[in-house]
Amino acid sequence: DLVYPRLATREIATFNILYSQDSSDFENLTNLVDPLLEADTYGKLVPAIAKEWGTEDGGLTWTFKLRDDVKWVDMNGNEKADCTAWDFATGLEWIINFHKNDSNNTSMPVEMIKGAEEYYEYTKTLSPEEARTLTAGEGSRFMETVGIEIPDDYTLIYHCITEKPYFDTVATYVCLYPMSQGMVDELGGADNVTSMNNENMWYNGAYTMTSYIQGNEKIFTKNPLYWDKECNLFDTVTVKMVDSNDVAFQLYQSGEIDY
């Protein structure tokens, strides 16, 4: 188990990683939700939910082959659903739906993916109520408009506007993170996603957040169904929020934190 401090000024602002643009959120949420790809300590792209990826036309079309053993779980590690290619479609629809995400993290997909800007502008013409009912399901306006294909549950294809040989680096960013439509439905619709918390969100990452006391403490608990069985994880990680580095040092001296 690990216990460490964080300044209270770096408190989490949202549990919806697709909405966040804040590094304080990312350092928490990226432990809870996994993307297609990650960068290792040397900056090299490594597999995450995508086990294979590539382009055969100079970056115009990108194909990602997904693992078939990634699960969405609840706070207590109970299985909710499989994580599939459709969750990445749902995530992208959320990002480029004007009334769902307030234009946060929209710029890269709109500039790179075919039809993304067209769909984004279309959602602007709708009322907030209409736009929030849209989904990325089969036969949806999103799937018909945007350059994303799902030949099967574990294959994801993006069509770029022009050749983007670096598009795989974008697959590490929150603009291409997944979201489960099952979670959206369980929460009661899009309006409740922005305000979701650690107790009702779904997880597919290394940890779940089993306790959250705002401005005080967060407890991350190892996800028992995490796909990467070779990853060395702490059973729990406790983050104690402190008012200053002086307070953190006092806690360290008293043995209440590890560093």
Model-derived features: where do they sit?
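Short, well-ordered beta-strand elements
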Residues: 1-11, 61-64, 88-91, 156-157, ...
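N-terminal lobe/hinge region of extracytoplasmic solute-binding protein
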Residues: 7-57, 202-203
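Second-shell loop/turn segments in exported
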Residues: 34, 68-79, 144-146, 237-238
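Sec-exported extracytoplasmic/periplasmic mature domains
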Residues: 37, 41, 68-71, 93-101, ...
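Gly/Pro-rich hinge or "lid" segments in bacterial periplasmic/extracellular proteins
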Residues: 41, 129-136, 141-145, 152-154, ...
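Aromatic- and charge-enriched surface segment that lines or borders ligand/interaction sites
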Residues: 52-115, 157, 248-253
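Residue-level recognition of beta-strand termini and adjacent short loop/turns
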Residues: 57-58, 150-152
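Short helix-initiation/N-cap motifs at beta->coil->alpha
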Residues: 239-250
